[in-house]
Amino acid sequence: MKKIILFGDSIFNGFRNGQDTDLVTNLFQKGLKDYAQVENISKSGATTVEALDYLHLIPQKSDLVVVEYGNNDAATGWGIRPERYEQNLNEILTKIGKAIVIGLCYPDPTNSEINQFYGDKRLDLFNDVAKKVAAKHSVQFVDILPAFRKLTDISTYYQKDGQHLTNKGNEFLVNQILPAIKKELD
């Protein structure tokens, strides 16, 4: 059985009520059924700066690492410069082997509290950096930002904080990524 590692931030941790959950991990496992074992080593609140410190947690015998970092990096209140994000993501992909890079997740555009830290230009900038780095390393890039932007009744996909996803949002997220994982492992 193949082994998939989820390596990201609170989006991959199914963050809810102030704590991590197995919601996203379970959705990936359900979608991959008996095809692959899913292990989640994501760290809520982490940027690519912390991700570099967590690289040693990735099991040596993994078949694919799904990298989902960028939203915390892009935040103006606690993030990093785009150049540093690019440098860190390059280093991560150089060290982990076979991977898929997930683009940035769109915060709820109706939530002014969370959006004070983002904005479309900044999200697009960091998303483009992730896309560029993925191309440089010849790894698949899953651009989820446009899919989230097209949602109707978008607030139903988010918790009250405007950043973390509801059950509906988590299902949507995982359904955007599963085809890429299956393609990579076939």
Model-derived segments and spans:
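Short histidine/acidic/glycine/proline-rich micro-motifs that form metal-
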Residues: I11-F15, S42-A46, D73-A74, D108-P109, ...
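Alpha-helical cap/lid subdomain in secreted, periplasmic
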Residues: L52-D186
